[in-house]
């Protein structure tokens, strides 16, 4: 599998980041977590993954110190400047068509879909070109209602069933993208 994963890490809860980290490491995928601050859980996972990969290389007979040093995790933490949409802009500029992107941010999802990326939210639901306009419209209506003091229904807290749903849908998406890539 050679496609990339891009994570809007500001909008993805820690429990879901762990699911993404484990899958990316297991499959050897390039995975970038983008946020306006460093996320300790991601940084630690990258260090642990790099250590495990270097141990594996040593076990396979690689002994040259420079060759060992070159072995690194394909997961990275990208810290962008604080500011409105700075992480979003970085993801849009960096993601290639057919990348898998994970975000809860509907305008970002729309921009990524226009670029030809696959996008899922923090519940594992896939954003599509067919439904993104409706989601953007709902977002505008909810924003207007909030400005009037009327609070629209919000998603509930992330719980174990939400995490399982995300994990299942994320795995299905990885399988689907892997098959698409193999077919090309």
Predicted ranges, named:
Residues 1-184:
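Nuclease catalytic cores that cleave nucleic-acid phosphodiester bonds
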């Amino acid at each position: 599998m050679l496609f990339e994963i891009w994570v809007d890490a500001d909008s993805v809860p820690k429990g879901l980041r762990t699911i993404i980290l484990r899958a990316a490491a297991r499959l050897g995928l390039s995975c970038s977590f983008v946020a306006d601050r460093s996320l300790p859980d991601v940084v630690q996972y990258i260090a642990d993954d790099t250590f495990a990969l270097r141990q594996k290389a040593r076990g396979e007979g690689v002994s040259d110190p420079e060759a060992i040093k070159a072995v690194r995790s394909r997961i990275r933490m990208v810290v962008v400047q604080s500011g409105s949409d700075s992480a979003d802009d970085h993801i849009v500029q960096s993601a290639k068509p057919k990348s898998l992107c994970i975000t809860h941010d509907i305008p970002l999802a729309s921009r990524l879909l226009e670029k030809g990326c696959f996008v899922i939210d923090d519940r594992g639901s896939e954003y599509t070109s067919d439904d993104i306009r409706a989601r953007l419209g709902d977002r505008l209506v909810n924003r207007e209602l909030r400005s009037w003091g009327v609070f629209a229904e919000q998603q509930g807290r992330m719980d174990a069933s939400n995490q399982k749903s995300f994990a299942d849908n994320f795995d299905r998406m990885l399988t689907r993208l892997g098959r698409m890539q193999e077919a090309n």
